[in-house]
Design a protein with these regions (language model features):
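Primary mode marks residue(s) on the alpha4-beta5-alpha5 output face of response regulator receiver
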Residues: 34-78, 85-192
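Secretory targeting and sorting signals
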Residues: 1-34
């Protein structure tokens, strides 16, 4: 059953998603990680729970609700050499899998649902550094296209990052380097 590398990666992604979803599924984000969970004002089965592990600098606004979480199954951050070094921003190219099916993440940064073709583009609002890897981010959505998975998304977190750091050392101007990375993306609606 898990005889191929692809099958093992999928199994690992599913296990990782289960953990992420257990941590954030059906909760409302609170501004302080020290707050005690309290019953929600709406819905008998809803709960307000502090979501641990999100640095204060990259938390979405209080009242934001998670609508989906996705794990990078294959991804790269591509850097272009300028002035003999790989500096500046990177261009993402990744495949994600999660609560709303499969998602393509690409330059923009943009995310497009492969299930319903809904599309969002966002801009970086804040970042939180992580040693030896690309930073965790909070992004604010600035464009929506289509109805569906991403129709109500207002914020995106890039969390639990690994890899993706620009290569060190000299390079030839114009050369590119695609560096593998991993992350969990959490999509949030704004408080209504």
């Amino acid at each position: 059953m898990l005889s191929t590398s692809r099958s093992r990666i999928r199994a690992l992604a599913v296990v990782g998603m289960a953990g992420v979803l257990a941590a954030i599924g059906g909760v409302t984000f609170q501004a302080s990680a020290t707050e005690v969970a309290a019953p929600a004002a709406v819905g008998a089965d809803a709960r307000r729970v502090a979501i641990p592990g999100i640095a204060p600098a990259i938390r979405p606004p209080a009242g934001s609700r998670p609508v989906g979480a996705y794990v990078v199954t294959s991804g790269t951050q591509t850097y272009t050499c300028a002035g003999g070094v790989f500096t500046g921003g990177s261009v993402p190219e990744a495949r994600l899998i999660g609560t709303g099916g499969r998602v393509h993440h690409f330059k923009g940064p943009s995310w497009q649902s492969e299930r319903d073709n809904s599309l969002i583009t966002a801009k970086k609002t804040a970042e939180s550094p992580r040693a030896g890897t690309i930073p965790e981010l909070l992004l604010t959505v600035d464009t929506h296209t289509g109805a569906g998975t991403f129709a109500d998304v207002a914020y995106v977190n890039r969390l639990l990052t690994s890899g993706g750091v620009a290569p060190a050392g000299p390079c030839t101007d114009g050369a590119t380097a695609a560096v593998p990375y991993g992350a969990v993306y959490v999509f949030w609606t704004a408080q209504k």
